[in-house]
A protein has these predicted regions:
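Short hydrophobic alpha-helices and adjacent helix-cap/hinge residues
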Residues: 1-35
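Short secondary-structure boundary elements
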Residues: 36-41, 46-52, 80-81, 181-182, ...
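P-loop NTPase Walker A phosphate-binding motif
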Residues: 41-72, 76-80, 88, 444
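Conserved Walker-type P-loop NTP-binding/catalytic site
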Residues: 49, 55, 74-162, 190, ...
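Conserved Walker B catalytic segment
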Residues: 153-195
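Start-of-helix signal in alpha-solenoid helical-repeat scaffolds, especially tetratricopeptide repeats
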Residues: 360, 381, 385, 400-407, ...
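Tandem amphipathic alpha-helical repeat scaffolds
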Residues: 370, 408, 425-432, 465-479, ...
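Flexible helix-coil transition and linker loops at the boundaries of alpha-helical arrays
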Residues: 394-399, 449-463, 492-501, 534-540
């Protein structure tokens, strides 16, 4: 974001960064700070100013954000943060990434070696650790939370550490658990934790003496006028327009900027930034009522090929790898790059990363949302399907890492068979990390996708197995009524197929549930039914499961 501290002052951010984040004090102690604001008031901009100022010289700064689809992706912001810390690149093979993680971790402190397997697993690198493989999901979850926390705290003993999380309103439950753990340990480390979020986000940090919740209010009239002087200039003829803009936008900085940009694009204003003049009279000027309407109008005025490019980028997400955009844009490379240059000049997108692969991002989350919403449903569906196909083609060796994104695009692209496959893989991956709520969301979405496939025997078998998957994640959450409902549905489907093996597993799972809730006699009835089925089928695995729970029921 190309803006100076002087420009930040012009934005009316009346609380100076030094007052918000006293970096000198964090050298001795830790603080956490959070912004709770509506979009467009300048949270991200103020953070950018702070982390790029002299106040953080000599600090290690780690940044991460949450995506709107990230709630179904356990640890997504944490993974981004770790990739930045270990200087992971998209092209890194597992061997190379293992070397980076192992080398940096052990050079930091050999006492962190027990955390190595958890960190490698988070980064989708096989740990090759038999002890890790023997752990059950809750134990892995605890090791993961402890490992990331210990890494950050140990690093903070070497140098002041700033950890920044953006858009916590989109955070997943496992990242939330890590933040809660980290906040508890802040008093013992030189660590500044910054977070921003919208008002609907809830947390339990408010009572901490070292936590500050901050709010950037909309600009007061005098600050809004100062911002408009910086944007428009000081032509006396602009004063009625300035007042109209201040009244219409209610002091929202992003709304003000976008409104000015709209007036420039529609030739109401002529000249250059900081030296505009009116080309028409104020009574004839119409300013849209909301920032979303301003953005929608700006997008509609783009040349058709640039509008299509922006919309395609929005379907990819807020972060847009150039290679992926090229794969779906259906434009020659020269045309695509020219279009991106124009979109940057219009301040709709900007380059977020140059190395090792060029990546773009939207100027603001609202820009991304409005661009995505401007697409017709059929075109949106087509682009999602193309993106899923492009990810498979571009990253064939990294599909495990990309599985949540693949599931997201395949489902919204209505590529139902792939959606079922990737959603089930994503759910299994989440369950392995003890991210049970995210696993449930994936498995339930897979069931929705499955309903769109032809009703074959294989499809019904998958429907049963997905309900078994749901059982494994719902039980740790204590959601027993939903669990029973899915098991009864599985039983009904298995009976229609006369699938005795799956009926046996339904009986085992019902027996386990009844036994765990203190109904041993009823549980034994189900387990004995499973034993009989196992004996008839000579199914060793089913027999072992039935005998195991039968032994518990008669104890």
């Amino acid at each position: 974001m190309a803006i100076s501290l002087k420009a930040a002052k012009a934005l009316g951010l009346s609380i100076p960064p030094s007052a918000l984040f006293p970096a000198d004090k964090v050298i001795q102690c830790s603080l956490s700070a959070g912004f709770a604001n509506e979009p467009g008031v300048g949270k991200s901009r103020l953070y950018w100013e702070f982390i790029h100022s002299h106040r953080t010289h000599g600090w290690l700064v780690l940044e991460s954000g949450s995506a709107s689809y990230g709630k179904a992706t356990p640890y997504l912001p944490v993974i981004d943060l770790l990739r930045a810390y270990f200087q992971s690149e998209p092209r890194d093979e597992p061997r190379k990434l293992r070397e980076k993680v192992t080398g940096k971790l052990l050079s930091l402190d050999r006492a962190l070696e027990p955390a190595l397997s958890a960190l490698l697993s988070l980064l989708d690198v096989p740990p090759e650790d038999p002890q890790w493989e023997r752990l059950d999901p809750p134990q892995r979850r605890q090791r993961t939370l402890d490992g990331v926390k210990r890494l950050l705290l140990r690093e903070s003993h070497l140098q002041p550490l700033l950890v920044m999380f953006e858009d916590l309103h989109w955070i997943d439950a496992e990242t939330q658990a890590l933040l809660d753990n980290l906040v508890e340990r802040l008093p013992t480390a030189r660590l500044l934790l910054l977070a921003n979020y919208r008002p609907e986000y809830q947390h339990a940090w408010g009572g901490k003496t070292y936590y500050r919740q901050l709010r950037i209010d909309p600009l007061p009239p005098e600050s809004a006028d100062e911002l408009l002087r910086a944007l428009l200039g000081q032509d006396p003829g602009l004063q009625p327009l300035k007042q109209l803009l201040i009244d219409q936008t209610q002091g929202n900085p992003f709304f003000l900027e976008e409104s000015v940009q709209t007036l420039v694009e529609t030739r109401v204003l002529v000249g250059e930034r900081g030296a505009y003049r009116l080309a028409t009279t104020p009574p004839s000027i119409q300013v849209p009522a909301t920032v979303q309407a301003v953005l929608a109008a700006r997008i509609d005025r783009l040349p058709p090929e640039e509008k299509r490019l922006l919309q395609a980028a929005a379907v990819i997400g807020e972060e847009v790898p150039l290679a992926l955009l090229q794969a779906i844009a259906e434009e020659p490379e020269e045309t695509l790059r020219r279009g991106l240059t124009h979109l940057q000049a219009a301040e709709l997108v900007y380059e977020a990363r140059l190395f090792p692969d060029l990546e773009y991002t939207f100027k603001h989350g609202l820009t991304y949302q409005v661009a995505y919403g401007s697409l017709l449903q059929e075109r949106r569906r087509t682009l999602h399907a193309l993106i899923a196909e492009a990810i498979e083609r571009l990253y064939p060796d990294r599909l495990t890492e990309q599985v949540e994104r693949l599931a997201h695009h395949a489902f919204r692209g209505e590529v139902w068979e792939k959606a079922v496959t990737y959603l089930r893989q994503a759910g299994t991956k989440a369950f392995a990390r003890s991210a049970n709520r995210e696993a449930v969301a994936c498995f339930e979405e897979a069931l929705v996708a499955l309903q769109h496939l032809p009703e074959t025997r294989e499809m019904r078998e998958q429907a049963i197995d997905l309900r078994f998957d749901l059982r494994t994640s719902l039980f740790p959450l204590g959601e027993l009524e939903r669990l029973i409902g899915y098991l009864r549905e599985a039983e009904g489907l298995a009976r229609t197929l006369d699938d005795q093996r799956r009926l046996g597993w339904v009986s085992i799972y019902m027996g386990h549930l009844l036994w765990s809730t203190g109904h041993s006699t009823d549980a034994l009835t189900f387990v004995q039914s499973a034993q009989a089925i196992a004996q008839t089928l000579q199914d060793f695995r089913l027999q072992v499961g039935a005998n195991f729970y039968a032994a518990w029921c008669v104890r």
